[in-house]
Amino acid sequence: MSKKRLHEIAKEIGKSSKEVVEYAKYLGLDVKSHASSVEEADAKKIISSFSKASKPDVTASQTVKPKEVAQPSVTVVKETGSEHVEKTQVSKPKSRNFKAEREARAKEQAARKQANGSSHRSQERRGGYRQPNNHQTNEQGNKRITHRSQGDTNDKRIERKASNVSPRHDNHQLVGDRNRSFAKENHKNGRFTNQKKQGRQEPQSKSPKIDFKARAAALKAEQNAEYSRQSETRFRAQQEAKRLAELARQEAKEAALKAQAEEMSHREAALKSIEEAETKLKSSNISAKSTADNRRKKQARPEKNRELTHHSQEGQKKNKKSWNSQNQVRNQKNSNWNKNKKTKKGKNVKNTNTAPKPVTERKFHELPKEFEYTEGMTVAEIAKRIKREPAEIVKKLFMMGVMATQNQSLDGDTIELLMVDYGIEAKAKVEVDNADIERFFEDENYLNPENIVERAPVVTIMGHVDHGKTTLLDTLRNSRVATGEAGGITQHIGAYQIEEAGKKITFLDTPGHAAFTSMRARGASVTDITILIVAADDGVMPQTIEAINHSKAAGVPIIVAINKIDKPGANPERVIAELAEYGIISTAWGGECEFVEISAKFNKNIDELLETVLLVAEVEELKADPTVRAIGTVIEARLDKGKGAIATLLVQQGTLHVQDPIVVGNTFGRVRAMVNDLGRRVKSAEPSTPVSITGLNETPMAGDHFAVYADEKAARAAGEERSKRALLKQRQNTQRVSLDNLFDTLKAGEIKTVNVIIKADVQGSVEALAASLVKIEVEGVRVNVVHSAVGAINESDVTLAEASNAVIIGFNVRPTPQARQQADTDDVEIRLHSIIYKVIEEVEEAMKGKLDPVYQEKILGEAIIRETFKVSKVGTIGGFMVINGKVTRDSSVRVIRDSVVIFDGKLASLKHYKDDVKEVGNAQEGGLMIENFNDLKVDDTIEAYIMEEIVRK
């Protein structure tokens, strides 16, 4: 909205700038001078107000200005008797206060009406200031006029008044004429004959009538005046409060300055006393020193004068300084040598016994009581710390029999002996290793006792193969996890969280196969409670005993869940008796272990099992501090083609947030994203919460600890340092040939080796597979793991296999198209598996030479899922298009997502449009269903293959 300046408004309406400024202030606008600007709406408001106020000027032919023309002019003439004063009052009025004018006019009208009565009412109405509703008042007054002749009387009265006023000034004659013409016009228009037209006639009363409007105007004027007084009182009270507050602030400031000045004066007095003491001490030393210096200068002066003078041929002696002497020494003994010094003419340079300037001495500093040192500190660093000269410390070391310079490093024993000589208690500084994240788990001061809260228990489910661990967890989570596991066994740790009775419980599902011993050990190390699953029909098995040993080693309580009690051959009592032999005694028998008989398949006694878990957790008093930086353990790690390194973490203390700088094992990074066990993104993870994170530089090892650092710089430094240490440790563990192991090395050359390269989907599977293959014992043959890593089989793996004559074993991963092509070219064998004991059996049979029939996998074709359709009571149908080869009805299929095999099974149905077909060829579309798998997604790759038996050469 545009703005206008006040002087422009004044020029537009023909008023002075001062009047416009005062009226703008009266309206409540924030203006200061004629140069101030106001909004367009406020400018229109000011112009309209002035136009209303100046309306009598426009109709000058009809009315007379009440205050500026008629009344003030008469008053001025009576008081001064001067025509010049009257003109001045009319032509140049003072600044107007509209509110005060309205109040004064209201009071004046009320007083005038009471004094003159009803006969002068019309004259006051015409002579007074026209209010906004004067027109309505005139109309109401016209109704009270009884006869048309009454208008004639009023007309004569107007003429008589005009004739009385006109001799005063020439302008007043013009006003009278206008009044008469206005009255005649009203008479002609019939404005005063309303009562006659209505046919009513009221008798004219001589007694004065009560003017209620005048009373109301007077009352309103009094109310306005009272409001003005109250506003002014409030304004003054506010100003007084502000003044008192400012005065209080000034007093507080002066008090603070006064206290500061007093403190400074005390300090100055103390410093002055110290300086006086030092001056007295120095004066005694200076006086003795100056006496000795003067005595030496008097003895040396005659020789110096002879050097500075020479004799001319006339025998006249002149003073001359030896400026050309390049060997002159400029020191204290020759301090009078000054090139710019001017001497008096004809006089020899003589020594003046002036007192030398006082030599500033080093201030005395007290020795510290304690000295914290580090190994390898230099003499200069020690001198700076204890505020002594390095030369003094070098001298002390020399007296102690140690030859050292100020830049030489000292060992801890020498530093302690030196501090003993000074009388200082020496302490070795304990340096905190920034790269050591294990200290967060061991340091009790890391947690804040006042912030300790109860946390959810971490429960690990252990047991033998196919005893129902994943089925139990599946029942708890109400999902079908077991159907997605190849071979019906769990391949790697899954971490899940459920809620029971308002409390959360975190479950870790560890594999039960013998190859996954290290994974079970890791699960036991981070758990709070162990649920030992034992099948009621099988009893105690080897992995059951191993799980018992892991739990006892970790010192965690054990809850025994006897599963499969719904089977006909179930015998829970036999299981209790067998477990008692290994120290697992039921509370019914006087032991400490809780036993619960369940059926995970039919959801029997599951609630009782969860109640037992919460009861044991309450007894254990599991606590955590969610306010500190997060620390915890890596449950699993894998390499994703699109996201990079993905690690499943279990937060044990603190709260993990997105964008936290983190060190995980020997790598570091920043948490870019966190996903919980339900696949939802979260911004934070509290204690006992499992999450998967991305953002790490490399894939960590399962079982590594992690810690959150204060900033990314510290995390980077710690991660790089840990990586260097791990590499150095690996190099140190490399065995070199010596005389002691020379015979063993030569003997090992006679043993044939089978070189393998292992690639798996997760780190835990890599470790388990490598450990299982190395443990295979066949006489004369051993397995050598050349390389093991997480991720898809790539070209570098094929190149390494060719160079080392190795076999590539892929576990739940697939080779890239380039790697497959290179393997065919270089004749490198790639074995792909999804069940770990199948790999072990195959390698073992190959080592023993018992592979009679050899089955070779033949790829029939590949297809891409373009659309999925979910049909109730049937499953998921995948609409696909063949991009290579063909897909047959009797072929096996693999579902590949991001180069990782997520399912391997048989086709349940194959259709081309609505017809069942035996095969779908290249570039054709069709629909398929896979047995026991409904998690098809768009862009999944379907690989069709068959197993062909080949004759071994």
Curated annotation (Swiss-Prot):
Residues 322-338 have a biased composition (Low complexity). Residues 563-566 are annotated as: G4. InterPro entries: EF-G-like_DII (IPR053905), IF2_II (IPR044145), IF2_N (IPR006847), P-loop_NTPase (IPR027417), Small_GTP-bd (IPR005225), T_Tr_GTP-bd_dom (IPR000795), TF_IF2_bacterial-like (IPR000178), TIF_IF2 (IPR015760). Residues 488-492 are annotated as: G2. Residues 51-242, 279-363 are annotated as: Disordered. Residues 80-89, 98-111, 149-188, 229-242, 300-317 have a biased composition (Basic and acidic residues). Transmembrane segments: none annotated. One of the essential components for the initiation of protein synthesis. Protects formylmethionyl-tRNA from spontaneous hydrolysis and promotes its binding to the 30S ribosomal subunits. Also involved in the hydrolysis of GTP during the formation of the 70S ribosomal complex. NCBIfam families: IF-2, small_GTP. This is Translation initiation factor IF-2. It comes from Streptococcus pyogenes serotype M49 (strain NZ131). The gene is infB.
